[in-house]
Amino acid sequence: MGEAWELSVEPDFPSRIVDGPTLDEVLRADPALLGKEAPLGSTALLVKLIDAADDLSVQIHPSDTDPALAAEESGKPEAWYIIGAEPGSGLYLGFRDGVSRQDIEMAIDREGAVDALMSFVPVSPGDLFLIEPGTPHAIGKGVLLLEPQRVSPGKRGITYRYWDWNRRYDATGRLDPGGKARAIHRERALSVTSWDGPRGDALLERVRHRAGPAAKDGTASLETLVGDCAPIGSEVFFLQRLAGSGDLALPADDRLRSLTVLDGGVTLHDGDTVLELARGQTAALPACLGPLRVELDVAHAMLCTLA
């Protein structure tokens, strides 16, 4: 599995300005960069790129209001935007209808197949999912995605591991049938699961939007995928997709934003200041920026903002 933390203020994996200090140091030194987030001291936005070469472990995140969280811990709501997917690949999202807590306990304790008790969702480029607290989930082999998350500044986003495909590893972390299993957070995972929430098709209707592949060969466009008046509403994220070739105007915003280029090229124009971005690069757009002229070159990019 390949994982890149594109925009992060977490102490263990901080983003760093090119040839400069960490992003967290820059934001804490100038509250104007944060806009609405200034009272927090830094940003709660965390953006990752994940390329799953194998099935990832089944995980779950608690809500921010979970009473079991320590003072230094935070919930971690997230979204998944599918960039690429091999034929037959997909996600595991929630338990299937009729699966009980006792069924999951037995599967874990007997080293059974927890994946057989989950809803498998085939995916295509352009699919977008909101992963709500209390929803068991896993990224399947062959999926490449962008993952924006919200983690309270100065705190550690919490993930509980439900199941890891009964794999074992040697001391270096390589697969080894004679090695040790990774830690499973059985009781905590079970306790934060939304057992009475929607499952299957009912869950997908609430959390999935199939936007289709980005129109890289068309004229420049800016499409809101998550947010007000968008296909999916969210109290956490505001997500937009840029695609095509040509110029477009990006309005000012009073929030810090993350722009990640997924394909092609993107050039940002702020008066006489020009910033060129290539595939795989991410720019943090401060809240104090005015309107920008964005030049797209057969581009596909995602703009991530906290609501």
Question: What is the predicted role of each segment?
Answer:
Residues 64, 84-132:
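Intrinsically disordered, low-complexity linker/loop segments enriched in Gly/Pro
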Residues 1-100, 164-216, 239:
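Transition-metal
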Residues 118-130, 271-289:
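Short acidic-glycine-tyrosine-enriched beta hairpin
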